[in-house]
């Protein structure tokens, strides 16, 4: 039976409800991390809590209960400055071995840890993880749901026979298990092991990731945003990108067909699109990426990603990109998405934008220019990717809102497409500007409902809540928390999950109270 919502203002005032208590009281630097994909097909159901250097927990919104995971073994002195962020389109990647069929693949590149029988067929809600295969013979990318697997590090992975691949995969074709990873940052003096990830598909941790160019001492407060290619506006599906086109990809029997852009010309560094919005503005998606999702003329080009250096506007815009390893054909199909290889971090009372390059495993402070003012305790960073594309251009998917914190009412906006290194709008004007944000302030972005307009905020670790409209730049009062808070602490203590039933979507906001174990949730009914 379809879910029908009929919330009425004033009658249906949003209210907080109790969930199961966390496994320990919240402390400084604790951080919730969650999947913001607007899809029940792709999304991970859990909310993760980095509780300490030795504790990572998960919360299951479908049961309202917590569970503990193995220790991440982070280095440093866990506390103020620690944080975590979920990157939904990361996960094990590599090549396939021979022996694939239209309903199975055999991995060649080993998983980071062995999996048990059928472990990949249940992500936590009874649905399997999604696997993308880039077939270098047919030139097609296809995404399917895993329904079974053998054990080990190079298992045979089975997909639903009702939704087969259009052709059997081949040896050396590419695979990506798009289960997501939780990236975790500890605090204190910089040391090897303060930055790691948890790989969800294999229930394993990375080794020590690079830390060069991070602050010498990680402290004060931190917040990060993952530029996932799976994050799209609320009117589009993951893997369709932000820019509509006149073509489709992955349209096999029973598959979920996806919109894309049809190229009309290509070189090693350019792609000319067609059927795009006439209102597309020049460089609106600079510093995003193009991804080749189908190329039946040059099949070895499929699956490639390339960062956009610039592009012209209009329905037939030309994208200038970093050189492809294999030049796509003039009839390739592509999508325009976030640069999936990036995580952006604000931290430690710095003006820098710390940029983590996932493939290279490097940090830099030069990809994006520094802010005009340092962040402080209560910093909140969110990319406003959810609203339907604004044809006027007043709102852009390239906007990253930075609540400065440190006792300031200032919100700074980084436009990652605003120049070769982005551009900043400092201390923007917004309606109802007065409230200051300090220790205890935290937030979570809800991109799937109400046109993806709202960042939900807990104010300074108190019982007061607010929400910020990213499209219309307005701060409004949120639903009051009728439960006393403990001592305010820095850390990411807000999260979002989305209930999806067909076309019906409903966001739930979660809050872990300060210096306490209480977890509460609220239906976003308005």
Q: Model regions: which residues?
A:
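Structural signature of eukaryotic scaffold interfaces centered on beta-propeller domains
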Residues: 28-43, 83-90, 223-256, 381-395, ...
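Short hydrophobic/aromatic-rich beta-strand motifs
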Residues: 31-34, 43-49, 126-134, 183-184, ...
């Amino acid at each position: 039976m379809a879910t029908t919502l009929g919330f009425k203002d004033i009658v249906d005032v949003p209210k907080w409800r109790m969930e199961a208590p966390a496994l320990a009281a919240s402390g400084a630097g604790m951080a919730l991390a969650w999947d913001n994909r607007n899809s029940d097909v792709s999304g991970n159901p859990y909310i993760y809590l980095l509780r300490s250097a030795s504790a990572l927990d998960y919360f299951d919104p479908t049961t309202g209960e917590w569970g503990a995971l193995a220790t991440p073994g982070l280095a440093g002195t866990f506390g103020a400055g620690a944080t975590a962020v979920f990157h939904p389109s990361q996960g094990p990647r590599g090549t396939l071995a021979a022996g694939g069929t239209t309903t199975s693949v055999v991995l060649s590149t080993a998983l980071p840890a062995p999996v048990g029988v059928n472990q990949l067929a249940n992500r936590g809600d009874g649905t399997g993880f999604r696997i993308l295969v880039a077939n270098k013979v047919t030139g097609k990318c296809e995404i399917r749901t895993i329904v079974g697997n053998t054990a080990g590090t190079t298992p045979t992975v089975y997909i639903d026979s009702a939704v087969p691949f259009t052709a059997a995969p081949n040896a050396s074709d590419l695979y990506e298990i798009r289960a997501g990873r939780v990236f975790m940052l500890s605090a204190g003096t910089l040391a090897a092991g303060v930055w790691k990830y948890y790989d969800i598909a294999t229930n394993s941790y990375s080794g020590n990731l690079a830390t060069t160019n991070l602050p010498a001492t990680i402290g004060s407060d931190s917040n990060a945003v993952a530029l996932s290619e799976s994050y799209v506006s609320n009117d589009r599906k993951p893997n369709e990108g932000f820019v509509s086109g006149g073509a489709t990809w992955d349209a096999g029997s029973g598959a979920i067909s996806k919109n894309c852009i049809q190229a009309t010309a290509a070189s090693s560094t350019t792609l000319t699109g067609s059927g795009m919005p006439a209102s597309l503005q020049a460089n609106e998606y600079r510093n995003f990426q193009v991804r080749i999702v189908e190329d039946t003329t040059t099949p070895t080009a499929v699956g490639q990603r390339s960062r956009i250096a610039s592009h012209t506007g209009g329905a037939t815009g030309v994208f200038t990109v970093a050189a492809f390893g294999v030049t796509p054909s003039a009839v390739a199909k592509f999508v325009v998405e976030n640069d999936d290889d990036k995580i952006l971090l604000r931290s430690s009372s710095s003006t820098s934008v710390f940029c983590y390059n996932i493939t290279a495993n490097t940090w830099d402070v030069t990809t994006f220019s520094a802010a005009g003012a340092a962040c402080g305790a209560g910093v909140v960073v969110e990319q406003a990717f959810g609203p339907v594309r604004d044809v006027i251009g007043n709102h852009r998917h390239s906007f990253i809102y930075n609540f400065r914190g440190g006792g300031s009412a200032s919100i700074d906006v980084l436009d990652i497409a605003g120049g070769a290194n982005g551009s900043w709008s400092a201390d923007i004007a917004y309606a109802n500007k007065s409230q200051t944000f300090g220790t205890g302030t935290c937030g979570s972005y809800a991109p799937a409902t109400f046109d993806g307009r709202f960042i939900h905020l807990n104010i300074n670790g108190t019982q007061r809540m607010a929400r910020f409209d990213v499209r219309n730049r307005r701060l409004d009062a949120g639903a009051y928390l009728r439960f006393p808070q403990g001592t305010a602490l820095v850390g990411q203590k807000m999260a979002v999950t989305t209930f999806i039933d067909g076309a019906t979507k409903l966001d739930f906001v979660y809050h872990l109270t300060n210096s306490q174990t209480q977890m509460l949730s609220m239906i976003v009914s308005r």
